[in-house]
Amino acid sequence: MKKIIIMLSVLATLLFVVSCGSKEAAKPAEGKTEAKASAGALKVGIVYSTGGKGDKSFNDSAFRGLERAQKELGITFSEYEPKDPGAESLNQLRQYAESGEYGLIIAVGFSMKDSLIAVAKEFPEQKFAIIDERVTDMPNVASLNFKEEEGSFLMGAVAAMMSKTNTIGFVGAIEVPLIKKFEAGFIQGAKYVKPDIKEIGIYVGGSNAFGDAAAGKAKAETLIQQKADVIYHAAGGTGLGVFQAAKEKGIYAIGVDSNQDNIAPGVILTSMMKNVDVAVFNLIKEVTGGTFKAQVYEFGIKENGVGATQFEFTKDKIGAENLKKLDEIKAKIVSGEIKVSPTK
């Protein structure tokens, strides 16, 4: 009888284990995806900015940094694309921190500064990073910032070289200091090449300023009506509409954040590369190596943080002489001979 009882007990235990293992795994929350985990790997949580992945710009660049870290450093990650970067981002950052699973939590974009600070104060032992904002005097937050005005100076120089109407345009998402840095550098670079050139800036505004291609196209068409024949954008996914307008109207455009040249080959002269992917990868590498620093990082041309593409589709259009001039301008920015202001 005793043996029978023991056997029944073992059988019951096995049935319980099998039944638990057969249950469907919990699904991630809406907007959240998980990369496959490996034992002992650093886990990174990331909350994207407005527009999310697929913008072929800012967010996609951050994602490339994660992918590289996964491949080269063996990290795993969870990612979240908020529909509302306000309360939704705050909740997701807190959820990551509360889990205790993440060695690093990254907030992509200036709009999450207040949310990140609030959560970082609640979890002082948790490492955080924010892109495109400055958080100081917090021992657990690293800030990754870029000298967009320097890269945009090069874009302005290219625009001035290629403009036949002596009028160039800029489409920004929202009129905030960060986006205005792009326009400021653009103007300075254009006037360095052609002091009398005219620049017209226009901003999209609204709650979907970084993800409204239709609005981007409409704004670009307004600039074209005012004789702008080269248009530079700093508007995330909204810029896709700028490219569409440029292609239809037979003018040039300039991309931003990622290499967007192949979206409309020959129409997009170049793109202002903002190497968010490099910054994200390097920070993750520091964390995996145990050297996380809670400081403000600044990435300019000298630090390979910003710059132009390789003009894959437009070398012949721009010409060797102009490309040589661009290299000279770049060298002067690196040496400090040309100083670029972040404001107009």
What feature does the model see in each segment?
Residues 16-19:
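C-terminal motif of bacterial Sec signal peptides marking the signal peptidase cleavage site
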Residues 6-14:
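Hydrophobic helical h-region of N-terminal Sec-dependent signal peptides
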Residues 22-344:
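A residue-level marker of the well-folded mature domains of exported/periplasmic proteins
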Residues 1-5:
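Positively charged n-region of N-terminal signal peptides that target proteins for export
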